[in-house]
Design a protein with these regions (language model features):
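C-terminal active-site "lid" helix and adjoining low-complexity regulatory extension at the edge
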Residues: 71-81, 85-136
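Phosphate-binding site of ATP-dependent enzymes
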Residues: 1-73, 85-90, 95-98
Length: 136
């Protein structure tokens, strides 16, 4: 599974984890250590294995989400995430992704790079709101 951490409309990082829920449990049983998910490996937003997913999230899917929900970009959570499974490879053999869920609460732990992205989003929103309030 790939967790795409978002701050507003920008990717703040990725978490990559082997999920074992869809494979038969080991002989030791479903509660055994062998049946538990693998560790979540955190990556920054520039991690090369996830750049196609980043482009899809920032350039296509998040703008579609904003349009579908009829909200502005500033209405997106400061920190949220979307979980993906790998889909079938495309005709060129590149990865595709299947959305599992979107989380807008309990989105921690986060990659080391994410706090800076979150702070930047908060700063931009505060400055935007400060400017909007100055017009009143």
């Amino acid at each position: 599974m790939i967790r795409c951490y978002m701050s507003g409309s920008k990717v703040a990082g990725f978490g990559h984890q082997l999920i074992k829920a869809l494979i038969p449990p080991p002989p030791e049983g479903p509660d055994s250590p062998q049946a538990q998910p693998g560790p979540r490996i955190m990556h920054g937003p520039d991690a090369s294995p996830f750049q196609s997913l980043r482009r899809l999230m920032e350039d296509s899917w998040t703008p579609q989400l904003i349009e579908t929900l009829a909200i502005d970009e500033a209405s997106l959570p400061v920190i949220w995430d979307a979980d993906f499974l790998y889909g079938p490879p495309d005709p060129d053999g590149a990865d595709t992704y299947v959305l599992c869920e979107i989380n807008a609460s309990s989105c921690f732990a986060i990659p080391d790079e994410a706090p800076a992205a979150i702070a930047q989003t908060v700063k931009q929103r505060m400055l935007h709101n400060q400017g909007a309030n100055a017009d009143r």
